[in-house]
Amino acid sequence: MAPPSTFDGVRDGLVDVSFVTASYTPARHVLPKMPELTGGGATAEINSVAYSRIHWKYFQAANEYKGVKLLGVFTHGPGQIFTVKKAVNTIDDLKGLKVRVGGGISEELGQALGASPFVKPSTESYELLSSGVADGTFFPPESIKAFKLEKVVKYGTIFPGGFYGSAFGVFMNQEKWDKLSKADQDAIMSVSGEKIARMAGQAWDRADHDGMEAMKAAGVTFIAASPQLIKDVQAKAAVVEQKWIKDAATRNVDGAKALAEFRQELKNVAAGK
C-alpha cells in the first residue's frame, strides 16, 4: 500500500490500524497543517503534546478523520533542510532548489521561498537524491538515517524549533474497533490521546538523536540558520500561516485562536506543564 493510501486502507478495512502523516492528504486534513508551520518547539515531544491538546480541544469536532477511530495525534521532530551539492546559507540559496517534500505545509513553504518542491513519498527519497532528480529534501534527522540518506546528503541547515513540522494521526478501522470488548477499548484508550502523543514524541526524539549522530559520522556539514535566514523564512512563512488560518475557517475553526493557543502550549509543555 502506498503511504498516501494509508488512511483509505484503514477506513476500508484493508488493514486494521496504522499511522501516517496528514501531509499526504492535505485536501482532506486541513487542520493538522497547524503544527507543520514554521516556529515549533525544540523537540518532537513538545510539539506532539501541544498539538494533541489543541486537536482534541478544537479540531476533533471538525471530523477530518471521519470513517476511522482516531486514537491519537503527534508530530515528527523539528524538520530541517538537507541538501546534496550546496549548503543553504541564505534565502537565495533556496531559489530553484528541487526539493522532495511530503506535501502540505512543507510544499507550500517551499513554494513561498522560491524553491521547486515536489511531492513524493519518503520511501523514494534515496533514489531521488542519489540520482540528482532532487537537490535536497525537507526532513527531520530521524528520516535521514531511516532512509540511509547520510550516504547522500552533504549539508544540513538547522533551524531552532525546526524549519517546518509534520503531523501524524494514529487510527483504527471503525468496524474492528466496534467489535472490541469494552475492556479492550478502555485499555487502548488508556494509552491513547495525550499519552500516545508523548510516547511517540519521545521515541522520535531518540530517533532524531540517532540520525544526527549518523550524519556526524558520515561527515555531513551542519549550518546553523543565521538570524537573517530565520527572519527571511519567517517573513515568507507568514503568508503560508495566514492561508492556513483562512482554510481553518472552512472547517468552522478559529485558526488564529487555535494557533495562538498552540504556541502557548508549546511553552507550557517545555516548562513541564
For each of these PLM feature ranges, what is it?
Residues 50-51:
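Glycine/proline-centered hinge or cleavage motifs at structural transition points of membrane proteins
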Residues 1-46, 56-273:
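N-terminal secretory/targeting leader peptides
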